[in-house]
């Protein structure tokens, strides 16, 4: 079993440290992890060209397609981001928009979790923003004893956020349990049946 972890910070600071805290718990539960830094280089946004409908992947062959292959094989995904203006890192959002729109493999029952790190505020807005990618993709969202937030400005300051780090450890433990439970359920019952063709309703016609 494996969890793909995306570090949405251009630095290995508090967001990266938050993911590391979770990775230790995953390892203790026998789950492999991979932390991928996604904001170190510019990531273009979606151009709405529709080419992915034919190709099955984004026409811009960059980190998005590389991460799509990793997600395809993973049992879970953690997205971590610093907070910029009560939102996630812009490069991360560009990546996620293209990743979830262009990758057409079934993400049903891959477990998701979002982590937001800030100096002071904006974490819950960012947390909600990131969770939207999971809830539109049939991915159960793991929860903890509190919202998955960490606090610190300078690299390493999150070490002083005892409650935040504990929340992340509980999150990883709960996510481990959920991943294992879903694996057993899939083995015994299979995935939920889907209707043959998705329905699309426009609000203007």
Please report, for each region that a protein language model flagged, where it lies by residue.
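Glycine-rich phosphate/pyrophosphate-binding loop and the adjoining helix
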Residues: 140-205
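A short beta-strand-loop structural module common to alpha/beta enzyme folds
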Residues: 32-41
């Amino acid at each position: 079993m494996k969890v793909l972890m995306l570090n949405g910070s251009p630095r290995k600071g508090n967001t990266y440290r938050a993911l590391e805290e979770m990775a230790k718990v995953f390892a203790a539960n026998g789950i492999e992890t991979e932390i991928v830094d996604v904001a170190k280089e510019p990531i273009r946004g979606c151009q709405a060209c529709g080419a992915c409908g034919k190709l099955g992947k984004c026409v811009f062959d960059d980190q998005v397609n590389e991460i799509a292959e990793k997600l395809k094989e993973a049992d879970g995904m953690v997205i971590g981001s610093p907070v910029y203006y009560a939102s996630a890192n812009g490069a991360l959002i560009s990546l996620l928009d293209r990743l979830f729109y262009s990758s057409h493999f079934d993400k049903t029952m891959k477990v998701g979790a979002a982590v937001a790190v800030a100096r002071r505020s904006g974490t819950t807005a960012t947390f909600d923003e990131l969770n939207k990618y999971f809830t539109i993709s049939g991915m159960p969202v793991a929860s903890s004893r509190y919202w998955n937030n960490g606090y610190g400005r300078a690299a390493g300051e999150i070490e002083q956020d005892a409650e935040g780090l504990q929340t992340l450890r509980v999150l990883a433990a709960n996510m481990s349990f959920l991943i294992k439970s879903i694996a057993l359920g899939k083995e015994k019952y299979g995935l939920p049946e889907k209707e043959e063709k998705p329905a699309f309703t426009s609000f203007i016609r």
